[in-house]
A protein has these predicted regions:
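N-terminal cap/lid segment of alpha/beta-hydrolase-fold proteins
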Residues: 25-75
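Short beta-strand element of the alpha/beta-hydrolase
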Residues: 77-86
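Catalytic nucleophile-loop/oxyanion-hole region of alpha/beta-hydrolase
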Residues: 93-94, 100-101, 117-150, 274-277
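Short amphipathic alpha-helix adjacent to the substrate-entry channel of hydrolases
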Residues: 95-113
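Primarily recognizes the serine-hydrolase "nucleophile elbow" in alpha/beta-hydrolase
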Residues: 133-215, 221
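Short beta-strand/loop motif that positions the catalytic acidic residue
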Residues: 227-230
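Conserved alpha/beta-hydrolase "acid-adjacent" motif
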Residues: 235-241
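C-terminal catalytic histidine-bearing segment of alpha/beta-hydrolase fold enzymes
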Residues: 242-245, 250-296
Length: 296
């Protein structure tokens, strides 16, 4: 399955051809050999991709997939990062919080793995339940294919925006056991990320009562170190990032870095801005280098 999200019937032919040219080296594969765990027939309409307000939105995902963006051989350092776009667990902001991020990672010599997880939220299931299954499965698949994809399984991080940041947090804190029955050998490998990069992560605290993380977020001394970027004027409370940072430090997890910028709002991804928050990619890159993950 090549470039599964983009279809000529949904985009102008020229745009489709440009996409194929830009991402010709990517490889995509479904996460599950059959239907994904807990999926019900007819629960989700046919998958859609559309651009609204300059944002490429992917919706109605019932067959989650992983797209590999390999770093150029001469620049590759063996590190990999699983990228989780945001979208409120209802859609996926697939370009500016997805493929564009993988391109940035490639510029650092890092192989990006773009996760197309299940949306929208499933009835009678926690908002993150199906996406967490997809993320855990993806981590195992990357490690299983580490030799083929030329990545070090001990240098495999996770990066998420907004709801994708919440998904990254759940993956960072729920790695002791799989949230689904074992499928194959990939599920015998660890789904613990080496680190997390959390950009305006959502659903960490209640919007009104902001003094505690939600109880499903279980930080421990084994939680990987994290980089946080948030803004004070974000509708998603920055207290979530602050509280998680403090909890990590309290439990002796070292190497965390927190940035709370005054302005910038929400959903900016890596788009240019006059606000200092636009420097977060440089800060994150410097953090990864300082932590030793970018070494060849």
């Amino acid at each position: 399955m090549k470039n599964p999200t983009f279809y000529p019937r949904l985009l102008p032919v020229l745009a489709f051809l440009v996409f194929q040219g830009v991402y010709a080296k990517t490889e995509s594969l479904f996460l599950w050999p059959g239907k994904a765990p807990g999926e019900l027939p007819g629960e989700v309409e046919k998958e859609r991709s559309e651009t609204k307000g300059g944002i490429l939105r992917v919706s109605n995902v019932s067959k989650p997939s992983l797209t590999v963006f390999p770093a150029e051989a001469e620049n590759a350092n063996g590190m990999g990062v699983l990228v989780c776009p945001g979208g409120g667990y209802n859609i996926l902001a697939y370009e500016h919080e997805g493929s564009a991020i993988c391109e940035w990672l490639n510029s650092l010599g890092v192989t990006g793995f773009l996760l197309k997880y299940r949306v929208p939220r499933r009835k009678n299931r926690l908002k993150h339940e199906a996406p967490l299954q997809d993320a855990q499965r993806a981590m195992g698949m990357i490690r299983k294919n580490a030799v083929e994809w030329k990545v070090d399984p001990d240098r495999l991080g996770i990066l998420g925006f907004s709801a994708g940041g919440n998904l990254a947090v759940m993956t960072l804190t729920s790695f002791r056991s799989r949230s689904y029955p074992k499928v194959d050998a990939a599920d015998e490998l660890s789904c613990r990320p080496s680190f997390g990069i959390l950009i305006y992560p959502a659903y960490l605290v209640d919007r009104k009562k902001r003094d505690k993380l939600f109880p499903e977020i279980k930080i421990s001394e084994d939680t990987p170190p994290c980089f946080f970027a948030h803004t004070g004027d974000d509708g998603v409370p920055a207290e979530g990032s602050v509280l998680m940072y403090l909890e990590l430090e309290k439990l002796g997890v070292t190497g965390n870095e927190l940035h709370v910028y005054p302005f910038g709002g929400h959903g900016y991804g890596m788009r240019p801005s006059d606000h200092p928050v636009a420097t977060w990619p440089a800060r994150a890159g410097a953090w990864m280098k300082a932590m030793g993950w970018l070494k060849k």
